[in-house]
Design a protein with these regions (language model features):
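Binuclear metal-ion centers of metallo-dependent hydrolases, dominated by the metallo-beta-lactamase
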Residues: 134-163, 237-293
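Active-site HxH/HxHxD metal-binding segment of metal-dependent hydrolases
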Residues: 82-151
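Pre-active-site segment of Zn-dependent metallo-hydrolases
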Residues: 54-98, 105-110, 203-218
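Conserved beta-strand hairpin/beta-sheet module of binuclear metal-dependent hydrolase folds
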Residues: 33-83, 179-203
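N-terminal secretory signal peptides that target proteins for export/translocation
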Residues: 1-11
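Active-site-proximal loop/helix segments of hydrolase catalytic cores
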Residues: 171-243
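Active-site neighborhood of phospho(di)ester-bond hydrolases with catalytic His/Asp-centered motifs
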Residues: 58-59, 89-101, 121-124, 197-202, ...
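Bacterial N-terminal signal peptides
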Residues: 15-27
Length: 293
């Protein structure tokens, strides 16, 4: 296991300029050809992101619905493990936190063992859960990158293949009852062509997000995945519009009751949401380098 305790100094060139403050819906629809950038919904907060041939997974391996949230459909779970399209050639897994509707050790370990070139990025709590399930001497743990970050700590970063990764700790929503859960916000640039961000179950606290403004501004985010309640909360909306300032946002963590009712949920929330496993969204106007086409 690789452990990040003291983040290295940030060396990210400022590229944020001229972005409109609003949050724009991502356009989905039939394509004449495979889009250069696309997000595919697994279920709950699980998303596959593909940009110019580079693929990553957020919160994809979990086993608990808590009686409220959708599980990844069996067929998709099988396709993930087998590496069948669109789940082929994945480079990395990202885990926001240890709750069972975002992460379970057994399916994550099964995937890592099936795909020996894939790395997993998460908190120390995630790494500890994997080590407990696998045994501390299991070689698979060498591909687990653990970030030891407290809220208020400097962001950390990492590079893996064509991925440029940075991560910051934002507390889990729910106040004191969730204070023992480490929630990480990952921002990942793929092939230097597009950048996505996953908020996990971050609290919609404007002061906390404003205190990280230099971090949010350090790179332009093309698509952010907030928990859907950010759209239903005035503070959450202001965070997306004034702090994150991504080109587009698609809410996740939508209850299973929304399956088949997406239009109604989107209308009620006033923003775009992933509601049905298998849904896709095109990510912006991406130009791939010739070698990645």
């Amino acid at each position: 296991m690789v452990k990040y305790r003291t983040p290295a100094p940030q060396n990210i060139r400022l590229t944020f300029a001229g972005l409109a403050a609003g949050v724009f819906a991502v356009v989905s629809g039939a394509q004449a050809h495979e889009p250069a950038g696309e997000a595919t919904y697994l279920a709950n907060a699980g998303v596959l992101v593909s940009v110019c041939g580079e693929k990553i997974l957020f919160d994809a391996f979990y086993e608990d619905s808590y009686g409220r949230y959708a599980l990844v459909p069996d067929e998709a779970r099988q396709d993930l493990l087998a590496g069948r399209p669109p789940y082929d050639e994945v480079s990395a897994l990202f885990v926001s936190h240890v709750h069972g509707d975002h992460f379970s050790p057994a399916p994550a370990l099964a995937y890592l063992r099936a795909w020996p070139d894939v790395k997993l990025y998460g908190s120390l709590q995630v790494a500890d859960a994997l080590a407990k399930a696998a045994g501390s001497d299991d070689e698979v743990l060498q591909r687990v990158i653990a970030f030891d970050l407290e809220p208020g700590a400097a962001p950390a970063d990492a590079v893996h293949d064509a991925l440029s990764i940075d991560v910051v700790a934002i507390p889990h929503s729910g106040g004191a009852r969730m204070s023992d859960i480490d929630n990480l916000v990952f921002r990942v640039s793929l092939n230097q062509a597009a950048t996505v961000m996953h908020l996990g179950d971050a609290v919609a606290d404007e002061a906390l997000f404003a205190g990280r403004q230099a971090h949010w501004d350090a790179r332009r985010t093309d698509l952010v995945f907030p928990p859907f309640w950010f759209f239903r909360d005035d503070a959450g909306r202001r965070i997306l519009e004034n702090n994150i300032r991504a080109a587009a946002a698609v809410g996740v963590h939508v209850p299973a009751a929304a399956i088949g009712q997406g239009d109604g949920w989107r209308d009620e929330s006033g923003g775009d949401l992933f509601t049905d496993p298998g849904e896709t969204r095109v990510i912006g106007d991406i130009v791939c380098a010739a070698e990645n086409r």
